Amino acid sequence: VDEKILRSVLIAAVREAHQNRTLNEELKKHKASFNLIQTCKFHFQTLEEAECLAAFAAHCFPDPERVLQGLAELMINAVEHGNLEIGYERKTNLLNDGTWRAEIQRRMLMDEYQDRFVEVVITRKDNGIYAIISDQGLGFNWKRYMTIDPSRAGDNHGRGIAQANAMSFDKLTY
C-alpha cells in the first residue's frame, strides 16, 4: 500500500469524522431551538413534502416520536383525501390494484388539483402546542374515523385518524 495514499485516506477519514461530530452537535443545539418557535406556517403539495414536513414539525412538540406518525397521517390525508379528493372506496380500490401512487401523481397534474396546497400552522401557547392542518378539499364526515370501526378492521387503510387521535395527540379536533 502506498504510504501517501494511506495517509491521504486517513486524513480524509479524520476530517469527515470531525465534521460529522460537529454537525451532530449542531443538530442537537438546533433541536433545542425548536422550543423557541412561537408560530410557524408551512405550505406543501405532495406526499413526499408531507412526510418531510411531519418529521421536521414533530420536533416542535415535547415528544416528537409520539406525534410524528399522527402528523404524517393527517398531512398525507390532507393531500390525498382533501386536495386530491380521493374517497375511501376509491383508495381501497387503488391500493388493491397497486395503483394508488400513480393515481396520486396523475391527479397532481390535473388542472383542478395542481394549484392546491395544504397549510400547516404550528403555534405554541401557554396551555400547549397546536397544529392546524388545512387543505383545499370539500371536507368529509370525520366523526366516523375518530375511532377504529370494527366493520373497517379488515380494510387495507382507514386507521390513520383513529391512531392519531388515540396515540399521537392529547386532543384531536376537526
For each predicted feature, which ranges?
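Flexible, glycine-/charge-rich segments associated with ATP-binding catalytic modules
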Residues: D2-F44, I129-I132, G139-N141, Y145, ...
